Amino acid sequence: VPLIVLAYFIYFGIPAAVKAIGFTDFKLTALVAGTISLSMNAGAYMAEIFRAGIQSVDKGQMEAARSLGLSYGKSMRKVILPQAIRTMIPSIINQFIISLKDTSILSVIGFPELTKAGNIIVGNTFKALQVWGIVAVMYMVVIITLSRVAKRIERRINVGKLEAN
């Protein structure tokens, strides 16, 4: 489901459904609805990242751990997950960056973030070029910084890893 549809459903649909049931005092703020929407959207992608990371570890690793007498849980904690995390970290950081960019979509429900602030400032000053230029630069600074941090983390987790020729 597209994030904007999910945000509209949670912000407008759920309160309407709850009020139809008979709860007249139910209120859902834009911040809460936006946070729920973004969390549900990112959660689906994160689950897929974790699934793929765990499946990327050779099945023989689990068999070896089990043959040594480790329980399933201990095999996952001590053998599978440490290897899977190495492959998951870049995707997790990438998903974080995507979620940060997705917050701009939530401005349509009044979610207080950078794009919403830009809209308010443009409405008050009528200086669209300057305001949107500053907003774009702010997004770029944050995204470039996060991308560089991701590269450092990626290099650090790959230290000592044998490269296949």
Predicted segments with their positions:
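Transmembrane alpha-helices and adjacent helix-loop boundaries
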Residues: 1-165
